């Protein structure tokens, strides 16, 4: 289908940060705007030099090597670490789309590069806009067959968390497996969900500072899922219509729905990326 990405993204509000912006400021900006990713641009020419995403924050909070900024450089002093410039944890190898790209190229990029959004740039690599999986799904909702069900699109290999798991352990699981969200399960039943966006909400608000007394990051990374998980989870079931689930994602601004049976036992998960496979 020949639709330019700019037709979808032309009126999108674009929020950026600079390489010198502090991690704390970037977190606050992401939280205030409810964005999961921010392009990092040079102040002088608006050229894209990086991107910071919710998964970079998960990595920073114990999920991977970016945690070294806290643990080693600042000896676990969280308050010092979040005042470092965002260039310390941003992704420099940015997957972008050119302004003349079509929607099929965007879908292929999301599916093959495992990214949920991409800055749109001109030939000089200057930022023009940004397009996400949700933008594409919203634009193509009417193209989904009313009778198509989700069963062939469900991701069946689901990794879960438990209510007693600590934030740092869940962060490691997310980064290791490249998953942005984990259903939280107790005695085989779904009781909540934790997402990479939740990390932004926690750290970009007053929660982290209210939760700390010494400034040591362990006061945050040792928090259990039962304290921070989202309990009111929107779910799907096998046999649900794909279009209905896509509409729920767009309307409720969520990236995935756990698929459960009548006893709330996990059967899989369906994500925005899974929905995009319909158009591939």
From Swiss-Prot:
The keyword Glycoprotein does not apply. Disulfide bonds: none annotated. Residues 10-67, 90-146, 154-209, 229-280 form the CBS domain. The lineage of its organism: Archaea, Methanobacteriati, Methanobacteriota, Methanomada group, Methanococci. Signal peptide: none annotated. This is Uncharacterized protein MJ1225. Keywords: CBS domain, Repeat. It holds the Pfam family CBS. InterPro entries: CBS_dom (IPR000644), CBS_dom_sf (IPR046342), Diverse_CBS-Domain (IPR051257).
């Amino acid at each position: 289908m020949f639709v330019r990405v700019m037709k979808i993204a032309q009126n999108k509000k674009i929020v950026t940060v600079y390489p010198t912006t502090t991690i704390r400021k970037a977190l606050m900006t992401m939280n205030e705007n409810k964005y999961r990713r921010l392009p990092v641009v040079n102040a002088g020419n608006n050229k894209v030099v990086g991107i910071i995403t919710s998964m970079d924050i998960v990595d920073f909070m114990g999920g991977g090597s970016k945690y070294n900024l806290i643990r080693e450089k600042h000896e676990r002093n969280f308050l010092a670490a979040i005042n470092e410039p965002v260039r310390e944890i941003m992704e420099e190898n940015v997957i972008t789309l050119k302004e003349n790209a079509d929607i099929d190229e965007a879908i292929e990029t999301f599916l093959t590069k495992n990214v949920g959004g991409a800055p749109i740039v001109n030939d000089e690599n200057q930022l023009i806009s940004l397009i996400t999986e949700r933008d594409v799904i919203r634009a193509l909702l009417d193209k989904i067959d009313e009778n198509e069900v989700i069963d062939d699109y469900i991701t069946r290999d689901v990794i879960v968390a438990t209510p007693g798991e600590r934030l740092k352990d869940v962060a490691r699981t997310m980064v290791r497996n490249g998953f942005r969200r984990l259903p939280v399960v107790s005695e085989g039943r779904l009781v909540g969900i934790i997402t990479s966006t939740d990390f932004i909400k926690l750290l970009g608000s007053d929660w982290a500072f209210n939760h700390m007394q010494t400034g040591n990051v362990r006061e945050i990374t040792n928090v259990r899922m039962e304290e921070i998980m989202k309990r009111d989870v929107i779910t799907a079931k096998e046999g649900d219509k794909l279009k209905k689930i896509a509409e729920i994602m767009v309307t409720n601004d969520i990236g995935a729905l756990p698929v459960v049976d009548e006893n709330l036992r996990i059967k899989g998960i369906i994500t925005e990326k899974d929905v995009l496979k319909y158009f591939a």
